[in-house]
Amino acid sequence: VHLTMDAFKALFKDTKLEVVRELSQHGEFASNLFVNIKTDKSVIEHVRVVGPIRKYNQVEITKTDAYKLGINPPVRMSGDLEGSETVTLYTDLGSITLENSCIIAARHIHATLLDKETYHLKDKMKAIIDTEKPGVIKNVLVKTSDTYTYELHLDTDDANAFMIKNGDIV
């Protein structure tokens, strides 16, 4: 879950957002705080807030989560939120309903421009996952920035299907 300052204050008041663990992409971190995601059908509890504070609110879930919540979010890249699902986030300190905020994150690769050239990466490419349970993922998008660390991003549904975990080399 990524939050704006207004949403953060609605949920956590004056609580401080602290770094628990740096993530692989420069400047991003797993925070010390958690929210609950609520819809008319169900709740998913204890979802970590990812820092830093953002310019937009974004809730990324899996298709499995979507079934539980009874919603049908689109598969999108981060920040492409128009027409996405509405969810309510709550904590012991507050709640907020976020319209056009919930997506299933598209499969993507973070890469520098040098990585993109070196590995001949292009948008909507195929990624071959060579593991104990191998397969091919189509339509993998490539995000480039000089600050990125070269890495494939999958959600837990995809990772579980290929029997891979965070940090595995594929």
Show the residue positions of the predicted features.
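Short beta-strand-centered segments at strand-helix junctions
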Residues: 1-40, 45-92, 97-130, 138-169
